[in-house]
Amino acid sequence: MKFIFSKSIIIATAFFLFILSQLPAVFLNFLNSNGDTYGIAHKNTPPFIILTLVVVTICIFIGIKCGFYQNYRKSLEWKNILLIFSLLIITFFIQKFVVQFITSHNLYNVSHQITNQMKVENILSSLLFPGQFVAVSILAPILEESIYRACFYKLFGYYRWTFFLSCFFFSYVHSGFSWDILGYLPLSIALTYVYHRRQVLTDSILLHALFNTLLFVF
């Protein structure tokens, strides 16, 4: 009974974190729905950043209570930082190559690509750079790693099949069942590997944040 209860708590936590992760985007869509586009980025950015930081704070608080951030100081070890930067560079170029391959062979699912692109552009185009940075480099890494790494491993245990399950779900949520999934697999594998090797959530958060920032800038 205790086992079932503990697993139920983890599932509930994952769903709650997922709902939290959607709040800033829903709020931004609400702000955009009034039809007044004059100075919209200047109007949207401050409240979006405030809400996003509140969401991130709640997520971190929940993560601390769930034990997600144990041994977080290990992320600052120089060998770990070297590994993360090495994976960052390798993953970045592999991802670029895979996306180029998919694009050049016209393998993208057009309907999904348009839907996903519209959502991303809707969020980013109506925000100033600080808001875009907070969304891409802070909100997404912390919330997604808490869900697809910490919660998954807490729920299913530290097994090889958990590794593959985490990789798949992270990629699937971003792409659906289409060739697009290949574009997300390199990052998904790198993030899951970083977490799987010693279960330090801040490792995968750091790699995720750096990768998103790199894509955002370039």
Curated annotation (Swiss-Prot):
Major place of residence: membrane
Recorded topology in the membrane: Multi-pass membrane protein
Location of this chain's protein in the cell: Cell membrane
Domain of life, per lineage: Bacteria
InterPro entries hit by this protein: Rce1/LyrA-like_dom
Keywords from the UniProt entry: Cell membrane, Membrane, Transmembrane, Transmembrane helix
The keyword Secreted appears for this protein: no
An MF annotation (GO) of this entry: endopeptidase activity
GO biological process per UniProt: CAAX-box protein maturation
Transmembrane segment boundaries: 8-28, 48-68, 81-101, 123-143, 163-183
Example of a GO cellular component annotation carried by this entry: plasma membrane
Family: Belongs to the UPF0177 family.
Name of the protein described by the UniProt record: UPF0177 protein YaiF
Gene: yaiF
